[in-house]
């Protein structure tokens, strides 16, 4: 195995670990509403960091964005908004299912929907049925379904074991949100495809191939930010049991700690761009490895962090054992789909 592939695997691990673990700092936020901490993290990950990075990368920030027509930018923005709906559902999935189970189910469903949606929308579903690679991909989808079912069963066992001690754990609500997450998260893939003219323009300015996609995040995540922040602000303004004033009236040391942990979560979320570095380091003939590595590391890291945070501190070990089996099945499914892409 050459150094490029080893480096690619390392960057994939960093990107997937950041994506899977970003919710961990939120777990340290105390006496704040979910909406307030999600908004603070979002301001960092969807607005501050994309704008800052793009400003540092581009020779002329305003000229670059001004060179595109509304017809080019609008689809990128709208698909970003679609992704934003998926992102809210992802965050709420973590809230109601926890990290280890939430990531397992959300990624499993995203794997299923993401694999099937593109060929269906492009009218090429027959390719999945009529080719060896397509049939292997469908096998991977079937295995992912089994994995999601196993992880869901682990959640049911956890629900029974923890009972009233699980304050926000809600299997039914979490499963519905995970399905919504899987459907709407496809917006990121569509947005990146629509943003290709922006990537080409960045490349023409001499920006390194590792970074050409980053300026498009200003538009993509701008769409997502409007959806996420609107959802949070409307709830904070209309629900009697939520209050920004109350959240920011906590003791000063706790206020600073909450802001820092929320901002750290936003930073870790943004560091998913290391995935692109890993993809760029993998030789073209092994492109399918990117999908396999990212999904596998994502589920693995999410499960490990969830266990370390003692989300599964039950009176019996059976739920944890079932969870581990389910996560391994989803990792297997990701690898089968990757092999199907390579066939």
Swiss-Prot record:
Record field: catalytic activity: L-rhamnopyranose(in) + H(+)(in) = L-rhamnopyranose(out) + H(+)(out)
Record's keyword annotation contains Plastid: no
Domain of life: Bacteria
KW Oxidoreductase (keyword) present: no
UniProt-listed InterPro entries: L-rhamnose-proton_sym_RhaT (IPR004673)
Any one of the GO CC terms: plasma membrane
GO terms for MF: rhamnose transmembrane transporter activity; symporter activity
Keyword annotations from UniProtKB, A to Z: Cell inner membrane, Cell membrane, Membrane, Sugar transport, Symport, Transmembrane, Transmembrane helix, Transport
Compartment(s) of residence: Cell inner membrane
Topology of the protein relative to the lipid bilayer: Multi-pass membrane protein
Pfam families membership: RhaT (PF06379)
Intrachain S-S bonds: none
Bilayer-spanning residue ranges: 4-24, 38-58, 68-88, 101-121, 137-157, 175-195, 207-227, 254-274, 289-309, 320-340
Biological function: Uptake of L-rhamnose across the cytoplasmic membrane with the concomitant transport of protons into the cell (symport system).
Family: Belongs to the L-rhamnose transporter (TC 2.A.7.6) family.
Database matches in HAMAP family: RhaT
Name of this protein: L-rhamnose-proton symporter
């Amino acid at each position: 195995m050459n150094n490029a592939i080893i480096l690619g695997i390392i960057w994939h691990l960093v990107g997937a670990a950041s994506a899977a673990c970003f919710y961990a700092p939120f777990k340290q936020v105390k006496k704040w509403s979910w909406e307030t901490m999600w908004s603070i993290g979002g301001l960092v990950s969807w607005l501050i960091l994309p704008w800052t990075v793009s400003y540092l990368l581009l020779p002329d920030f305003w000229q670059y964005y001004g060179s595109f027509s509304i017809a080019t930018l609008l689809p990128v923005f709208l698909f970003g908004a679609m992704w934003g709906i998926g992102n809210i559902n992802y965050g709420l999935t973590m809230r109601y299912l926890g990290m280890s189970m939430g990531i397992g189910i959300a990624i499993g469903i995203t794997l299923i929907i993401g694999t099937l949606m593109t060929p269906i929308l492009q009218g090429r579903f027959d390719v999945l049925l009529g080719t060896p690679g397509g049939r292997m991909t469908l096998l991977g989808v079937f295995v992912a379904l089994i994995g999601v079912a196993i992880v869901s069963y682990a959640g049911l066992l956890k629900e029974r074991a923890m009972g009233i001690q699980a304050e926000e754990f809600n299997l039914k609500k979490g499963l519905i949100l995970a399905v919504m997450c899987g459907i709407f998260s496809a917006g990121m893939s569509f947005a990146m495809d629509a943003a290709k003219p922006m990537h080409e323009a960045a490349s023409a300015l001499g920006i390194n191939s590792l970074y050409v996609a980053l300026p498009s995040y200003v538009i993509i995540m701008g769409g997502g930010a409007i959806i996420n922040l609107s959802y949070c602000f409307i709830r904070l303004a209309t629900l009697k049991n939520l209050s920004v004033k109350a959240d920011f009236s906590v003791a000063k040391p706790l206020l600073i700690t909450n802001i820092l942990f929320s901002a750290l979560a936003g930073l870790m979320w943004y560091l998913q761009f290391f995935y692109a570095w890993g993809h760029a380091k993998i030789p073209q003939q092994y492109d399918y490895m990117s999908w396999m590595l990212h999904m596998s590391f994502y589920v693995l890291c999410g499960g490990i962090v969830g266990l370390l945070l003692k989300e599964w501190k039950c009176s019996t070990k059976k739920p944890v054992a079932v969870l581990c089996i389910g996560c391994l099945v989803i990792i297997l499914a990701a690898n089968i789909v990757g092999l199907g892409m390579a066939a």
